């Protein structure tokens, strides 16, 4: 049986992991065994946080909208109910941007929601 030489494959695999671990602290960027664990953990965090990012942004948008509509004398839930009744289809991302940067336009939208609710 012929001798199997696999140094090239092992080197390639190690280099790939160490390249992914570049910039990590201490042994996590230098020692293959530790680097491999660090890269796997980083991947798990990245996967989890890609999903959490969507939740966090939605929560941020809702907080901004809530702050803006309370300045105009309406709660968040009442505003959303009013917008649905008035068939104004603006998503929360755009609403929050208006609440922060275009206060007059946001106030006009809140007034329309108030008018439908009254």
Curated annotation (Swiss-Prot):
One of its GO terms (cellular component) is ribonucleoprotein complex. One of its GO terms (biological process) is ribosomal large subunit assembly. CDD domains: Ribosomal_L20. It comes from the Bacteria. Keywords: Ribonucleoprotein, Ribosomal protein, RNA-binding, rRNA-binding. The keyword Ribonucleoprotein applies. One of its GO terms (molecular function) is structural constituent of ribosome. Belongs to the bacterial ribosomal protein bL20 family. HAMAP family: Ribosomal_bL20. Binds directly to 23S ribosomal RNA and is necessary for the in vitro assembly process of the 50S ribosomal subunit. It is not involved in the protein synthesizing functions of that subunit. PANTHER family: 39S RIBOSOMAL PROTEIN L20. This is Large ribosomal subunit protein bL20. The gene is rplT.
């Amino acid at each position: 049986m012929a001798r199997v030489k696999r140094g090239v494959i092992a080197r390639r695999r190690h280099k790939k992991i160490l390249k992914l671990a570049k910039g990590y602290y201490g042994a996590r960027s230098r020692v293959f065994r530790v680097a491999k664990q660090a890269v796997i953990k980083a991947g798990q965090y990245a996967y989890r946080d890609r999903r959490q990012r969507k939740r966090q942004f939605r929560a941020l948008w809702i907080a901004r909208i809530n702050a803006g509509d309370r300045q105009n004398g309406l709660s968040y839930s009442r505003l959303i109910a009013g917008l649905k009744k008035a068939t104004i289809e603006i998503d929360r991302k755009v609403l929050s941007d208006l609440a922060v940067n275009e206060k007059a336009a946001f106030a006009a939208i809140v007034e329309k929601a108030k008018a439908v609710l009254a």
